[in-house]
Amino acid sequence: MAPSNTERALPVLAIWAAIGLAYWIDSQKKKKHHLPPGPKKLPIIGNVMDLPAKIEWETYARWGKEYNSDIIQVSAVGTSIVILNSANAANDLLLKRSAIYSSRPHSTMHHELSGWGFTWALMPYGESWRAGRRSFTKHFNSSNPGINQPRELRYVKRFLKQLYEKPNDVLDHVRNLVGSTTLSMTYGLETEPYNDPYVELVEKAVLAASEIMTSGAFLVDIIPAMKHIPPWVPGTIFHQKAALMRGHAYYVREQPFKVAQEMIKTGDYEPSFVSDALRDLENSETPEEDLEHLKDVAGQVYIAGADTTASALGTFFLAMVCFPEVQKKAQQELDSVLNGRLPEHADFPSFPYLNAVIKEVYRWRPVTPMGVPHQTIADDVYRDYHIPKGSIVFANQWAMSNDENDYPQPGEFRPERYLTEDGKPNKAVRDPFDIAFGFGRRICAGRYLAHSTITLAAASVLSLFDLLKAVDENGKEIEPTREYHQAMISRPLEFPCRIKPRNKEAEEVIRACPLTFTKPTSA
């Protein structure tokens, strides 16, 4: 007997009933769990009028105290923005729930207009990002130091000579050191000690890029439809900015890669990330696609490390000038270990006080005060708070670094906070390294490389130089202003100081350091 119409309809009705029940349960959960606290929202625009235009990390930290919560939420034209003001909250969500919190928000300015969409560190979570990360990790693996440590030693020695010859250009030399080391490791290219075109290109690019990557810097990121407005219409300055950035992106991605390819073809090259990757491409089934991917990853390495590492090293110099008693203690430790020779990577564990100084550098002035934004790919509930799917999530590294529960008197520069009374590392104190380089699956892939360069440079400089406050025409010391260029990446502005060899023996070591050197080759 054929089933009746009612019998045929029953399975369909059951499916729809199940779907309806699922939606009802989901809606009840959302009603039960409210959003994290934050300023009162206006209809449609939300908190657009409340969002700080600059130094937003301090505002968000203050709001957290006002609402007695280490997680707060605001909205901008329908977009949920969640700020995590404690390391515990960041680890709970970005690390332990990384399956939900590992994507990146889409930026119309960055991903569509500026030409910088190739930067895999800012890509959404997915295969393209994983491929970029794998390529980087394969070459810059911290367990294979023999590849890159000799280059760090080479360029740090040149850095010492640069400081000796032109002591008034500290931050220029810092950028040259980091940029040169990165270029050598990535492309096998050598740079000039002064006014190198590749280093200058990175400097121009990162200044412009840091602006477009700053949250809320351009209205087109809040109202994406504005991208269709012609460039000649008043109020569309983002088009001019994007055009400038496209030029930078092209040269950063293409120019050093082209030179590296030409060197490799002649056989006169130093092994590098690019040379190793090009050799791997010989067996590729999709060589053209993989070649473009390689350019993307190399360009990312070239620009990313050059700015963040230089910022931290610049802060180290500023701190040593501002806090001479810290400098002297570090020098005493170095003298007891080195006995007049230059430091090497194997010496790092013998420098507990210097290691504490570098930890305090990371904490005192975070390089990325708001971190790099994450984005949720699903609804979540945390401490009875509903965090909507698609929320942009910031780890407020500045708030974490100034958390009095972890770091009493956070305004003080005090390396001793990381040491026990007998001068050994105090593992009970949260290591700022675990904050400074991000969280979860999106943690900075180059963190160990950056830390190695910073530590070697800091140890080498303090073993040979005194970093002193500048003096005016009356011989009175000039206190550095401690001002920073504030954007997504915070970097110290130029500050007056004096740099001089500690003694005659130190000067002899410095004078022997080369400004140029014979390039090792693949042969």
Swiss-Prot record:
Q: Which residues does heme bind?
A: 444
| Name of this protein | Cytochrome P450 monooxygenase ple1
Q: Which GO terms describe its cellular component?
A: membrane
**How would you describe this protein's topology in the membrane?**
Single-pass membrane protein
Against InterPro entries, the record matches this protein to: Cyt_P450 (IPR001128), Cyt_P450_CS (IPR017972), Cyt_P450_E_grp-I (IPR002401), Cyt_P450_sf (IPR036396), Cytochrome_P450_fung (IPR050364)
Return the EC number: 1.-.-.-
PROSITE patterns of this UniProt entry?
Answer: CYTOCHROME_P450
**EC primary class:** oxidoreductase
The family note in this entry says:
Belongs to the cytochrome P450 family.
GO BP terms, alphabetized: terpenoid biosynthetic process
Species this chain originates from: Rhodocybe pseudopiperita
Give the record's glycosylation annotations as residue positions: 141
List the keywords (alphabetical).
Answer: Glycoprotein, Heme, Iron, Membrane, Metal-binding, Monooxygenase, Oxidoreductase, Transmembrane, Transmembrane helix
Cellular compartment(s):
Membrane
Broad class of the protein's primary localization = membrane
Family annotation (SUPFAM superfamilies): Cytochrome P450 (SSF48264)
Essential cofactor(s): heme
A Pfam family hit:
p450
Identify the pathway.
Answer: Secondary metabolite biosynthesis; terpenoid biosynthesis
